[in-house]
Each structure stands twice: as C-alpha cells, then as structure tokens.
Amino acid sequence: MGKFFPFTTWGSFPYNTVNEGRADIMDKQEVYAFLKEKNLDFEITEHPAVYSMEELAQVALPYPEADAKNLFVRDDKKRNYYLITVKGDKRVDLKKFQKKHGTRRLSFASADDLMAIMGLIPGAVTPLGVLNDEERRVEVCLDRDFLAEPGKIGVHPNDNTATVWLKTGDLIALISEHGNTVHSVQIE
C-alpha cells in the first residue's frame, strides 16, 4: 500500500463530504464554515479515514503531540453522557475516572447513542460533535494538558477523514457557547 501524504491548509477546504448520519448535523464542510464564521484560526489536515488511534499513528500529522483521543461514555442509568478528550497517547481508566469525578458507573455509549445524540459514527468522535447535541446532554471532560503551551488541539470535524487544529481555548469557548458543560480534568 502506498504512503499517503496528508497536507495542511489554512481556512476553508473545497471538498464535498457525504453526511451518512442524521440530516440535521454539521458535516465536515459545515464545521469549516462555522469555524470561519466565528473568525477562528484553524488548520486542516486531510487524511484517509481512521477508526482508531493506532490507524491515526500511521498518518504523518503536523502536530501529533496535540492530537486528541475521544471516549464517548455514559453512566449505568443512561442519564448522563460524557465525552472524555485526552492526549492521544494517554489511557483512560473509566473506574478511576468515575471515582475521581464522582460519577455513576461508566461504560462506553453505544453507536446508536453516538448517532442519536451527536450525529457521529464510531471513529469520528470529536468535541465538535457536541455542537450537534441539541439537548446539551453531553458534558465534555477535557484533559487539562491541552491547555499547556502551545494550547493547540487536533480534533475531527465530525468526519474521520480530516483533523482540524485549533486553539484549545477556542474549542472550549465554542462548546460553552453552545450550552454544553466543559470540565478541565487531569488524566494521568
């Protein structure tokens, strides 16, 4: 298999994407347009579809230290949903997370829940997906290491064929402005 050379660009991107999920969610192009409308500085890296951190590790990214891993979890009563966003090289122990943050027992949310709440498929989970959470059910638990200099984070634009690099503070502001809660958490 040939090596894929992703490229990075500033601002908008002229590609079409197909939204295979809910019709009311922001697709990749709409995310780019939304970020431009908010006058945010961002950078885009296009790459083949990736469904795991192992697959993403095979892609040459401009800021691999800022790439995010996202875990969409729920409590045992399916009342509370959390998006745990950590640096890509970290592991999250859900039992330790639950104990430290006082949640009920946590497990991974189903693909159906992911689609119903954030309009995403497995492999495309991203903090930008909470912009599709009309009921503001998802609380984002963001690894505080993303706040350290240079304060950059790489997340999917609701599609696993690209990574958007933006300031962590801008991402927090977007999510908060939408009405979802953002927690800064320490993940060892």
Spans of model-derived segments:
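Extended, low-hydrophobicity, polar/charged segments
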Residues: G2-F4, T9-E188
